[in-house]
Structures are given as C-alpha cells and as structure tokens.
Amino acid sequence: MQRLSSASVRQMFIDFFKEKGHSVEPSASLVPFEDPSLLWINSGVATLKKYFDGRVIPENPRIVNAQKSIRTNDIENVGKTARHHTFFEMLGNFSIGDYFKEQAIEWAWEFLTDKKWIGFPQERLSVTVHPEDEEAYRYWHQHIGLPEERIIRLEGNFWDIGEGPSGPNSEIFYDRGPEYGDDPNDPELYPGGENERYLEIWNLVFSQFNHNADGTYTPLPKKNIDTGMGLERMVSVIQDTPTNFETDLFMPIIEATEALASTTYKEADTAFKVIADHIRTVAFAVGDGALPSNEGRGYVLRRLLRRAVRFAKSIGIDRPFMYELVPVVGAIMKDFYPEVADKQDFIARVIRTEEERFHETLNEGLAILSDIIEKAKATNKETIAGEDAFRLYDTYGFPIDLTEEYVHDEGLTVDRAGFDQEMEQQRQRARAARQESASMSVQEDVFGEVKTPSVFVGYEHTETDAVITTLVRGKEKVEQAVQGDVIQFFLDETPFYAESGGQVADRGMIVTDTGQAVVKDVKKAPNGQHLHTAEVTIGEISTGQQASARIEVRERLDIVKNHTATHLLHQALKDVLGEHVNQAGSLVSSERLRFDFSHFGQVTPNELQQIEEIVNEKVWQALPVDISIQRLEEAKAAGAMALFGEKYGSEVRVVRVGDYSLELCGGCHVRNTAEIGLFKITSESGIGAGVRRIEAVTSKGAYQFLSEQTAILKDAAERLKAKRLSDVPQRIESLQEELRKAQRENESLTAKLGQAEAGNLNDQVKEIGGVAVIAAQVDAKDTEALRSMVDTLKQAHEKAVIVLAAKTGNKLAFVAGVTKPAIAEGFHAGKLIKEVAARTGGGGGGRPDMAQAGGKDPAKLDEALAYVHEYVKSIS
C-alpha cells in the first residue's frame, strides 16, 4: 500500500473514475442554492438531487465528485472521538440510470486493491450487505472472490429516507490490525460493529426501489448508484494514524495551535481537535458567503467559534487567535479548494471581528456563570435555571450549548425547557413590536382564490385606462365603495409598481365616472397580482367600472433616480471594499435610498469618500441604462449580480448601466445616469454582525441636504465668531485648547481638595489590632476621585484598611484600599468591598490592594461602613 497525501487520494479517486467515463462535478458551495430543505450541503449527493429526481438530465449519466460538506447535528462529540467532524469531504461516484450494482462493486474493489491506485492488501478488506441482497452477496463472493466469513449480512444495510428512492447498500471495511482490538469476547468486534479496528471506508448505495406512500416498495424503472467515501477517514487508514486528526489534513493546524498554546496536543488533544475541526468549518463557510449571526447558519458559525474559544482558554490561549489559522487551512486545501486561500484576508477579518466581540463579554459572562454554578452547588441544586441560561445568552452572547458544556463539566445540567420558554417569550415580544402591514392582512382570506390577472404596464406608462376587477372593504368582497371607505382592489392592468426588491410602491389615484380614490400602497397578492390599497375621496366606485389610473409622476421620477443610484453604489462598494460585498437589504423611496451590505470592519472616511466619488463620476459620465429580458443562465454567465436568496424564473430582467453595473432587477430606473444629477452619502453605520448600512440622497434631495449642511456650518461660524466658513476648524481647535487648559486646572484643584479632605480623615482613624482603619463618607465627584483619596491615605499609614464612600445621585460609589503589610496579614480589598456593597444592595470586587463597587440604597450606608470595623476585628 502506498503512503499518499490527502491531496493525492482525492485526485486519485477523481482520476480513476474519469478513466471509467465519469464527468467531474465541481464541488458546490456549502450554502445550498435553491434547496430550502438544507441548512448546509451535507453530503456528496446533496448537490445532485436535480439529476436523481429528474428535474435536470445530466449530459453524462456517470458523475464523480469531491464535495465539501458540513454536518452539525452532534457538535458536542467533536474533539472527544476519533472521527467526528463538522466539516468533511465526501468522495463519490454516481450513476444516473446507467451502470448498477456489479459495476459499482467491481470498480470499488479495483480502486482499493490495484497497486496502480490505493493498493490495499485484499485480506484486510471485508464488506457488509443487506440480508436479502443476494445479488450483491453473490457478486462479492463469486466474482470478487471474498470468502464468506468476510461478507457480513446486516439488517441496517438499507438506505431509506421515507417516501422516494431507496435501496440496499454495501459498506467496505478496512482491518487496521489487532493493535486496535483483539478481544474475542468483544461483541462489537466485527465489520459494522462499534470498534476502532474495522473502519468503514466506502459506502455503496444501490438505489433500486421506490418507497411508496402506502409503505410498499416497487422497482425503479431506472436504477441509480450513489457512493460515498469520507476523505478524512480514508486518509487516516492510508497514513496509518490513530485518528483522523493526525493526518496531513489536520496536523498543520494542530501544530500552528501548539505554537500559541501553553501545552501540547499530546497533553490536551480534545481542545486541539475542537479548534482544528471548527476553524476548517468556519473558514470554508465564510468563504462561501455565510457570516456569523444569531440565526440559521450564521448561528452555527457563531456557536463553533465560541466553542473553540472556550477550549482555547483551557490550553492557555486567552486572546483572539482563530483568524491566524486561516492561512494554514488555505495552504492545506488550496490545490483543490482555492477559495479559502483566495479570500483569506476577508475570512480572517470576519473571524477576528467575531472573536474580539466574544472576548469583550466572555470573561464577564464566565464570572456570572461561575457565580450561578457556585450558588447552585451551595444550595444542593443539580440544575441551572433556564432564566439564568437565557440571561447569559441574551446579555453575554453565550450559546445555550456552550453554557450546557460548562455546566456539564461541573456535574450539573441546564433547565433547557425553561430556556426555551424564555426564548419563545422574547420572540413573542419581538413579533408584538413589529408593525403588521394592514394592506396585506386580509389577502389570504379574500384574495387567495382570485386568479384574475393584473398586468403591470408601469415600466412604459405612468397612467392607463383599466377595469376594476375586484373590490374589498374590510375583509369582504363588495360591489361598491363610497366616500370615506378604505378599500383594496385589483385592476386588469396597472401603472402602479408594487413594493418589492426594496423599491417602495407608487402612489397616485384612480378616477371613474362616479368617483375617485387615492392610492396609498400597492403590494403583491398571493397569486402575483398588484393589490392596491386606497381611500375613496369623492363619490363612489364599483366593480366592473372603467377607471383612469395615474401614478404620482414626480415621486416616481425621484424613486427611479435613487434606484439606479443604488446599483451604482453596489458596484462602487465592491470596487472599494472588495468582491465579498453583497446586498443584505435595501430601501428605495422618493426621499432617499438605504443600502445594507455584508462587510466586516469599519468603512473608513477615506473609503466612504472614494465610494461617493465613484458613484458621482458614473452619474456625470451620462451612462446609458439598458434593460433587457434574458435567460437566467445567460445573465449570470455575463456577470449579472443576483441577490442571494432571491428566487428567479428561467427568464430575468437585466439592468445594465453602461459597462459599469449589471444586475438582475425588476425595479424602475432612469434612462441615463445624468438624470440622477448628484449623489450624496448622508450616513454610514453598522447594524449587525457583518452588516453595514449606507443612507444617501440624490438630485434635489442631495441639493437640499447640502444646503442644510451649509446653513448649519454658517450658523456655527457665527457662534464661533469665525469670519469665513474655512476658519471654523481653526477656531474650534483654539477653543478646544482653551477647554483642555481649564480642565487641567480643574483637575489640579480637585486633587488638592481631595488631598485636603483625605488629610482631615486622619482624625477618624481607629486602631484595631495594630491596623489603622478608616471607613467614611466623603464628597467626591466620581470613583476616580475616591481612588485618589484612598491612595493618599495609604501613603500616610503603613498598615491600613481603608473604605471610602460617596453619594452620586441616588446611588453609592465605594473604593477600598489595603496596604502591603495589611495584605500580608490576610486583609483583601476585593473581598471586603464585595461585602460592604452587598449591604447596600450593590456589588463589586477587585485586587487585594485596591477594589471598587457600587451601591443602590444610600439609607444603609452607615450600616455598610460599620461592617468595615467588624471585618478587621474578625481577622485581627
């Protein structure tokens, strides 16, 4: 058997099946495309469903692939076992109605045993088959030549996911030798049992039946082959490593982690395994467009990163570091998966940002969790309240799984039902806070069955003659509506744009012979028609009437300027910040535009200026805006940007702005960028993890914004007594220097007053067991002033315990100080201040020599300060 690298095994598998007439299917993105049933691509066959279910006929019915995959159903086992992974590769060969069982078995055996390929010793291989699959048994025994004792019949060898294709499967096992198990009394020591000796290296699925709805099975007219070989497991056998983690797929990551840790892989293998596995998953997922967040696949990434940080702390890594491993992952995989190496700067930036965000709250959260665990143990409780677990999640970003792991290490459990209840209450609060759209509230009841078409003519026309086909008032269809009624209606054709793609709906009016109505909103009905919401302002309106429908042209003109500007902004963001930028949301109205986009880190003022300059340059170049209908495949091949998650038909509307921007879009646009006039960014901010927002105005809105800003600047100049607007910065700088000088003088005076007040406290010193004790209320503006007084008193007394308190509004501030000789006798400022503050309903802590705290009940201050003397007496 050859000792091969992981890259060689992967390529060898593909080359073998290419020789057998298979076409190579490229590895798909981990983020599923048009498959809402999957959170991640989780197997080699997951991306080939379109072929197996007949939606697409492949050019070649023989397919081979190496597919990156993610499974996260048992994250807690990763690191604790030899072969659990969240990210892994599946090698597979597939037949869509072409070859079947005999050929699949023959080629599998050839690849594994022929010295031209893997070259395993034949005597090391065993197989399992389904008890009723005589065909597979006979072929393995008679054609391949496997002895009967190495063909094991197992009831579980049947691939079935419910209704749909199914069939028996045959698994191939490699015997790693007696050093991995030789107990003749072990009931699991056989191929297919739970043991480390016989490892499954390949699964051949023979899809030959259809599982019918009534539970019966009927033969498929076209039989299929679906095989899967886990690369990590196969490589561990070839490289003869105890677990998958010692292979060349993981060891470079583990070695890079060892260089940062205070211990070694040999001494703490679980932590290193967790980190190595999780960084592979996160790096590839981010490279494929997923970003950490609080829901869906983003939550999975956040959970993995935070779990890795937790294990990193156990090996002495107490800072953001996972991002430093991204180049290592990229280097291992670059030959076949170049995307991590190509995007490593962006991936590292995303991971670092997420790590830093978690580290900001981690220590505080751990301290809270430690207190919760301590209290539970002190009261002999075995369960942590769900309310406490939710507080850790909601306030400190602790995923519930992470809390459960910490708690489990302490021999406790979490009330998961209580946690879930708190989560549901939060969701209900969020739902209640969201405003429901009244115009759509009756759609499902009234309009769900309406199939009458409504043709949109608003791309070409701003008004049209139409027929009112359906009228609704309240939740009922009506034949007539009168002045004052709020109604919803369909027209057989309409110039009103229905809100979609971020563009707001048109407003306007309809006029009939007997009345008129003002249209306030338009949305898409369940069956795709444009549903108008309006108020009858004159006379009456009836179903079947002819109506003149007119939009507010001035508003539409402003909307189209902002919409085309949004396309220019999208491309400019990619040009300046990088190709990773993708649209995450938008609003296009007549007053402004808002654009949300994926990007980690701040957008610098210089970058923002570049973006604005690029958009304006394209506006002033007077680029033509061309709109065409194309086939989806052609548009994408031409480089048209499609919105992630948006569903497109086979034909799409393509908006091209000169040679600069190309997007799929159903919205309304200018005919030439010169119509936009001027583009001005009004704000830029972060609105969530990895998502930022730009707001901007165009044309008249940009002029008005700049006029307002100029007016504000003129007003500031007058107040600052600056002769010219250009003098304002210099005048501000001069005033700031005067302010800094005054602050320094104020601080000096405050310090002198503090020292004087501290000196007066020497009269309140009490000697207890040779220790100078001062516990007093003083006048101090803040905690810093208190600390200064305590420092002054510590310098005046060799062996002292000091607690000073000050009222700040309705609250209390405490600072405690203990001199070194007093610390040597067992006094501790942090422990003392915690008890003092607790007596006023507060809390705090700190070092042995200096600590601070806050209190909530000023009425109990005297009682709290009196405790200081009791504390000193208890130790003296």
Curated annotation (Swiss-Prot):
Keywords: Aminoacyl-tRNA synthetase, ATP-binding, Cytoplasm, Ligase, Metal-binding, Nucleotide-binding, Protein biosynthesis, RNA-binding, tRNA-binding, Zinc. It comes from the Bacteria. Its cofactor is Zn(2+). It is found in: Cytoplasm. InterPro entries: aa-tRNA-synth_II/BPL/LPL (IPR045864), Ala-tRNA-lgiase_IIc (IPR002318), Ala-tRNA-ligase_IIc_anticod-bd (IPR018162), Ala-tRNA-synth_IIc_core (IPR018165), Ala-tRNA-synth_IIc_N (IPR018164), Ala-tRNA_ligase (IPR050058), Ala_tRNA_ligase_euk/bac (IPR023033), DHHA1_dom (IPR003156). It catalyses: tRNA(Ala) + L-alanine + ATP = L-alanyl-tRNA(Ala) + AMP + diphosphate. Gene3D superfamilies: 2.40.30.130, 3.10.310.40, 3.30.54.20, 6.10.250.550, Bira Bifunctional Protein, Domain 2, Threonyl-trna Synthetase, Chain A, domain 2. GO terms for biological process: alanyl-tRNA aminoacylation. GO terms for cellular component: cytosol. Its main location: cytoplasm. SUPFAM superfamilies: Class II aaRS and biotin synthetases, Putative anticodon-binding domain of alanyl-tRNA synthetase (AlaRS), ThrRS/AlaRS common domain, Translation proteins. Zn(2+) binds at residues 563, 567, 665, 669. Its EC number is 6.1.1.7. GO terms for molecular function: alanine-tRNA ligase activity; aminoacyl-tRNA deacylase activity; ATP binding; catalytic activity, acting on a protein; transferase activity; tRNA binding; zinc ion binding. SMART domains: tRNA_SAD (SM00863). Binds 1 zinc ion per subunit. It is an enzyme of class 6 (ligase). Consists of three domains; the N-terminal catalytic domain, the editing domain and the C-terminal C-Ala domain. The editing domain removes incorrectly charged amino acids, while the C-Ala domain, along with tRNA(Ala), serves as a bridge to cooperatively bring together the editing and aminoacylation centers thus stimulating deacylation of misacylated tRNAs. PANTHER family: ALANINE--TRNA LIGASE, CYTOPLASMIC, ALANYL-TRNA SYNTHETASE. Belongs to the class-II aminoacyl-tRNA synthetase family. Catalyzes the attachment of alanine to tRNA(Ala) in a two-step reaction: alanine is first activated by ATP to form Ala-AMP and then transferred to the acceptor end of tRNA(Ala). Also edits incorrectly charged Ser-tRNA(Ala) and Gly-tRNA(Ala) via its editing domain. This is Alanine--tRNA ligase. It comes from Shouchella clausii (strain KSM-K16).
